[in-house]
Amino acid sequence: MRLRHLTEALPAVLSWTGGDVEIHTVVADSRQVQPGDLFVAIPGVSVDGHRFIAQAVEEGAVAVVGERPPQELGSLPWGSFTYVRVPDAREAWGWLCAAWHDFPSRKMTLVGVTGTDGKTTTVNLVYAIMQAAGLNAGMVSTVSARIGEQEIDTGLHTTTPDPPDVQRYLAQMAETGTTHAVMEVTSHGLAQHRVAGCDFDVAAVTNVTHEHTDFHGTVEAYRQAKARLFEGLASSFRKPGVPKVAVLNRDDDSYRYLSPFPADRHIVYSLSGPADVTAREVHLASDRTRFILALPGGEMQVETPLVGTFNVSNALAAAAVGVALGLKPETIAEGLAAVQGVPGRMERVEAGQDFMAIVDFAHTPTALQQVLQTARTMAQEDGHAPSARVIVVFGCAGLRDRAKRAMMGRIAGQLADLVIITAEDPRTESLDEIMAESAAAATAEGKREGVDLWRVPDRGEAILLACRQARAGDVVIACGKGHEQSMCFGTTEYPWDDREAMRRALQGKTLDTLPTARH
């Protein structure tokens, strides 16, 4: 593909130095450059891609896209490559990857789901609804991508994949005849333009609560990042006969902020107020949820293995997307009922024990509050003793939103009977200091160390302690890691799986893959 043709996709080009050339592929890592490649020099938080232009050209790059003016780049072999200057290299990378694959999202109806909590579950529900409708559907979540019969793991930690992966997944979907796709869109993915060049037709939000102020700086900046998905509806590529629809949560503060963004149609869902999509007669049990789903086209009884009020809200969001796609109520209800569970989301681990053992991804204050409230409901059901307790294991990540540590410690202190604070990706921060911040907040809520509050640095030992403390009817819940397959200490990712750790703990053993383990 010619460079001129590729760069026609860019929102803006500030200057062009050199001639038109044939491009082999688009890369943003100088170590991956092959002869004939276009190298995108992206300024990062700690490393500036402009520093590697010379290396990229030496490896054979014939063109470079960057932000800095040529005169600031110093001595380079200018006659041997073309330099295209843009206002935002990261955004350009997204558009270039989309153009390289001939804008695959324009060949299907694309749904984007964003929000603080519940995105992955909602995406799985939407995908199931599409399948129930007999659509040739695809999905990209922070857990996996599903393309035809193929399922691809999308990474160690949960965020929207980088532009080359996003566009490759969509291109593979287009090649296999996918007509409808749903994508989980994180705030990082939006702020870093990972979905630039993705033309969404439906934008849906679960909720926008406290999260990621370490990255975005302020709650307002975080909210603005989420809003980009809705802001882009009006300017995105129009597909024949496919309307642009915004799906909004009237129960969430984001409703007031997102509802003014223009769309062909706004579909509103709510657990408690007037809306297009609602639920009534909600019955929560420890192993399933029943409710009547009220849609513009009628009412349907829904029964799902997903538990908790928050999952009813996720189901309503997915149902509203189904309405946006013009699907029948019975099809929507069938899809909701088909999802048996989502990896690492209120996932039960069974080994014949007389208490419930659960793994959940809850890693934000709101999510922790919701899962602990649900765990309390579960502990009080099914003939359990009135004294059945909730035992929580959780931690807070290093180099991330510090305010969450006290907030989550306070919530755990209020809502759990026994609190065990442990590691969750401490990175280069002191694990002891992270745990101390959460422990202080739990103590302020009346918890006493050594009585109903413990700090256990090794996560495997923490989960084992929780299981050893459990009595018949109790609920043990390990929060924060969910389906993730690694934990970061320093700058190293160590193999880790909360579900395997829980299975071992139920056998009286520990998963000892972390540097905190006692060997």
Predicted regions and their residues:
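ATP-dependent carboxylate-amine ligase
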Residues: 1-14, 32-38, 44, 48, ...
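N-terminal leader/targeting and accessory segments in enzymes
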Residues: 1-95, 99, 275-278, 301, ...
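Short, well-ordered alpha-helix to beta-strand connector turns
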Residues: 23, 36, 61, 80, ...
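A short, gly/pro- and small-residue-rich
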Residues: 49-61, 83-88, 92, 201-206, ...
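Short internal beta-strands
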Residues: 62-68, 245-250, 393-394, 417-425
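Short secondary-structure boundary segments
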Residues: 66-69, 185, 207, 250, ...
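Acidic, Mg2+-coordinating active-site environments of NTP-dependent enzymes
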Residues: 72-79, 176, 199-357, 441-442, ...
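Phosphate-binding loop of NTP-binding sites
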Residues: 91-248, 256-262, 316, 510-514
